[in-house]
């Protein structure tokens, strides 16, 4: 097993115990450029009193598009609470807010050189798949449980 790991460059790097791992300096992350230090007040409309009504046609459409079974009461309650939350945050004023791409804006990302270390390992990769068809993975259909 160790011989197999030593062939791959990324495994060599992971198995070296004498190299120090790059750690995040959380003291530097106290105030990234676009994240405010203090919370911004926002007024949310009170939507807890209004009951969300979803017709069966909409539920069937959501089930088909998301491949999620919404037949249980728990799933419907989760969907309704998600809609209430979305209604709350839809009223937040974001007019003068710059887009945030990452919370770790001041942290440098360490990249390795993009070099091919091994090639043509298709057969080895396909051995990880439970079901294959003509050198392709076969994924399970939707939310149908797989046979054990």
Swiss-Prot record:
Single GO cellular component term: mitochondrion
The keyword ATP-binding is annotated on this UniProt entry: yes
InterPro entries (UniProt xref): Asp/Glu-ADT_sf_sub_c, GatC
Note: This protein may be expected to contain an N-terminal transit peptide but none has been predicted.
Family classification: Belongs to the GatC family.
Cystine bridges: none
Keywords, comma-separated and alphabetical: ATP-binding, Ligase, Mitochondrion, Nucleotide-binding, Protein biosynthesis
Record's protein name: Glutamyl-tRNA(Gln) amidotransferase subunit C, mitochondrial
Known function: Allows the formation of correctly charged Gln-tRNA(Gln) through the transamidation of misacylated Glu-tRNA(Gln) in the mitochondria. The reaction takes place in the presence of glutamine and ATP through an activated gamma-phospho-Glu-tRNA(Gln).
GO BP field: glutaminyl-tRNAGln biosynthesis via transamidation; mitochondrial translation; regulation of translational fidelity
Listed PANTHER family: GLUTAMYL-TRNA(GLN) AMIDOTRANSFERASE SUBUNIT C, MITOCHONDRIAL
EC number: 6.3.5.-
């Amino acid at each position: 097993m160790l011989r197999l790991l030593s062939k791959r460059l990324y495994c060599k790097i992971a198995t070296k115990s004498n190299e120090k791992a790059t750690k995040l300096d959380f003291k530097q992350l106290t105030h990234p450029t676009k994240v405010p230090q203090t919370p911004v007040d926002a007024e949310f409309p009170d939507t807890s009193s209004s009951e969300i009504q979803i017709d069966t046609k909409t539920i069937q459409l959501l089930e088909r598009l998301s491949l999620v079974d919404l037949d249980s009461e728990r799933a419907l309650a989760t969907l309704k609470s998600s809609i209430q939350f979305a209604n709350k945050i839809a009223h937040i004023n974001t007019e003068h807010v710059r887009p945030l791409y990452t919370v770790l804006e001041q942290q440098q990302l360490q990249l390795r050189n993009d070099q091919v270390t091994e090639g043509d390992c298709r057969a080895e990769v396909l051995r990880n798949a439970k079901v294959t068809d003509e050198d392709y993975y076969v994924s399970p259909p939707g939310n149908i449980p797989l046979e054990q």
